[in-house]
Amino acid sequence: MKFNHYIIKGQNLTELQAQQDGILSAHPQQQVAFKRYFLPDNSLLRQLPAEEGAVSHIIQPVLCEGSVALWLVLCEGFRVRYQGCETILEGEGFRLIVTASLTCPDGTSEEQTRSIFDAYATLLQGHGLTLEGNCVRTWLFCDDIDHQYAGLVKARREFFAACGLTPQTHFIASTGIAGRPAGQPAAQPAGAGTPSFAETREYAPSGVPAPAAARAAIVQMDALAVEGAFTQRYLYARTHLSPTYDYGVTFERGVRLDASGHHATLISGTASIDHKGNILHEGDVAAQTRRMWENVEALLDEAGDAWSNVRMMLIYLRNREDAAFVKPLFDERFPDTPKVFLHAPVCRPGWLVEMECIASA
């Protein structure tokens, strides 16, 4: 079981495709397990090739290095099958199912999220799997996150509870971040006086629906499910991070997966937070970056991993201009780690930066 992660960046899709072709030619024994394109807007969609399997497209503008990027995951040692929006990887005694770009473009963010999880549960059922028993990682993208995320959170919490995913059992490692489903118009701005996610903290609002004539996808999900000879261990780092349910959300901070003598540690979206759920270093993006690293390191330590095993990073910034401060910090500490900086506001306005990563050995 082997995975290689590549972050490819370019000024246009032609550059991206040329780099991808070079990587694939250099590794003919490897097959594509997953792709995610990070796009500045919808103008490039017609230039993208038609591709089968788990291929994700999200509007999250690339900062600093080019205007488009691709997270490419190659695998070796699997039988690979592409089926609709899924890539199915079969090994000896285990199976991985990667799903991409699930949307249900009708209704509020709450209604769309519920429909997406319904659809995903149905897909898993077709493989003889369940959300609660087999899904280990999700990525949830939410347009107009400051006003639409509350509905997403409410729907996910209620759906999980109905599946038996509670504080007494476990949740699923996840990133919840701003991102517009590709091909969709921007979400209609919330009306004056509409409470934001950060203002409510009770997550009561269900999101603001777009006008009937302009229904569009607000929420998109990618996911990973596993079956068979895997052991999984959820990560908490309670000395540094609070349980997510303390502030009303329902995901795990990370998960370590082991199979066939290999392991992967999937770290969820992580920001500058303390063990009581408070934002640390408000207004100081450099200090938030350092605390974020400290939190991620605590999770890696708990997994028995280290920065030296990290194979890729995604870094999300609320403010475009902060890339000029954050990128040099990452480049100095992690000069050789594949990474990309994206304009994607975090779920609370006070958080200026968030990151996720994958470690393996």
Predicted feature locations:
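N-terminal presequence-like segments and the immediate start of the first folded domain
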Residues: M1-A361
